Each structure stands twice: as structure tokens, then as C-alpha cells.
Amino acid sequence: EAARYPFAPYSGTGLEQGRRGSGGQGIAAQVWGMTPVEYLHKADVWPLNPKGEILLGLKIENHRALANVEASVSVSGIGFAEWGPGDMGMSFGLPDNHDEPFPKIMEEARSRILAATKHAGIAFLNTVRVDDVEMRIDEGVKIGAGPEAAAEKGRRYTKRTMPW
């Protein structure tokens, strides 16, 4: 609701009327390279608005967020979720477990978040490297954060091309 304007359709979304206010669209439209009126219609949440260009995501990065992950990723308008291994580890009392290999409790947390995103039909964001991007794609990672070489390898693996 906070990311949507009051005029955005909300019937059937499980959300209330948008609460985003007026006034900031002039400068934002300049940044986006369009008129304020165009901005008002494009600066909406995809997939609720198929023409919207804002993608909302969640970072599930501690045990409290993990306890609610299934409900959180089911909120209308959420497009992806990721886990935060560094903070997740700290919340489990593991101050230096931000990199692989992860202990069992961390692997279980990541698996639960990945499963929740699959069930909700949204993307899972995870770090990818050149040496693991294909495995990450196979396990269900839809948004990979990593170096350009990993992105290129992932595009070749999925036979996807960039539009430019």
C-alpha cells in the first residue's frame, strides 16, 4: 500500500487503497526521463500493475523474519525475496557465517526462504559466482547477484539474451 498511489487499482489484491502521496513525482519524473503524468503510471508495483516498473523485494535476514517468511512473501505485490546470510547468522549467534560453507541451521534457513518463494510464485535472489551459477539456476534462483561473467554464463545456460 505504501508504494502505490491512491488511484492505483487495488480490488482483488488483498490490499487497501494506496497511500503514496503527491509532490515528489516532478523530480522523480526528471530522473526517470519522463513527464510527471507518465511517472505516476509507471512508478507502480509490478506485477500488480503489468506496466509498473517498480519491483518490491524482501530481505529475510534474521530468525524473526524467517519465522514469518511464508506470510511475508505471500503479500500481494512482492516480486522477490532474498536471504541475508550475514545478519541471519548473527541472529543465530554465528557472527562470522556470511560466506559458504554454511552450518546446517543456515542451510535450513536458506532452504526455507527458497521454498517459500517458490510456493508464492515469486523470484528468489541469491549471490551467484561463475563456478556455481548453473547450479543456482537449477535449484530455483531467479535473480542472481554477482559478477558480469556469472551473468553472461547464466544467460548462455538459460539461452536468454539481453534486449540491447
Locate predicted features:
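Active-site-proximal loop/turn and secondary-structure-junction residues that shape catalytic pockets
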Residues: I60-R64, D87-G89, V130-D132, A150
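C-terminal helical cap(s) of enzyme catalytic domains, especially alpha/beta-barrels
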Residues: E1-A8, H98, A149-W164
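Alpha-helix-loop-beta-strand connector modules within alpha/beta enzyme cores
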Residues: E1-P9, L48-K51, P101-F124
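Hydrophobic faces of well-ordered beta-strands that scaffold small-molecule active sites
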Residues: L56-I60, A81-W83, A123-T127, K142-P147
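Glycine/Thr-rich beta-alpha phosphate-binding loop at enzyme active sites
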Residues: I78, W83-I105
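Catalytic cores of alpha/beta
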Residues: E1, A65-S76, N126-I143
